[in-house]
Amino acid sequence: EEVLELVNLEKDRKLKIKALSGGMKRRLGIAQAILHNPKVLIVDEPTAGLDPEERIRFRNLLANLAEDKIVILSTHIVGDIESTCNNLAVLNGGRIIFNGTTDEIIESAKGYTYKVKVPKTRIHDFKNRYVITSQQDFGAYVETKILYKGKPESEFKRVDPTIEDGYLNLLYDIGGTKQ
């Protein structure tokens, strides 16, 4: 009962598994994994398929579990990393290319992250020249966030990087393009 409560399934404990939604089945799998209080818990994309409220609950559960056990989280969801991890490793082609703290991966992109307002008429050329980490369309122009290690142009505005910027910076450092 206690484990079902942790994963918010106590009210559904009498349902057959086939009657559970995809997110509920995922939470049931986590309940099975923590049932015998393992010293190491390995979870793969644990919040995929969960609604936003359950995603937050589950991130908090992982953070609490990590207080007295090792939790290995495999995910592509940056929000999961930001909410639950102190240390992380980045794999590329089966090799560890980074092992450190979340602050260290963010720091790796510091000084290389810019916001630039690009006229729509120039966006295609801009995409070919720079690593764009995000963009937002404002009609006549597109506000882009880029990684760039060369001398910045006058319209480039330096901004603080995120974990995602640090991750992309690592990938381009090891054999990427546009730098």
Feature locations, PLM:
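ABC transporter nucleotide-binding domain
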Residues: 58-145
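ABC transporter nucleotide-binding domains
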Residues: 1-73, 78-92
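Non-catalytic surface loops within mature trypsin-like serine protease
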Residues: 11, 120, 148-150
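Conserved protein kinase catalytic domain
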Residues: 4, 59, 106, 164-168
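Residue-level marker of structural boundaries
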Residues: 5, 67, 111-114, 172, ...
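C-terminal coupling/interaction segments
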Residues: 130-179
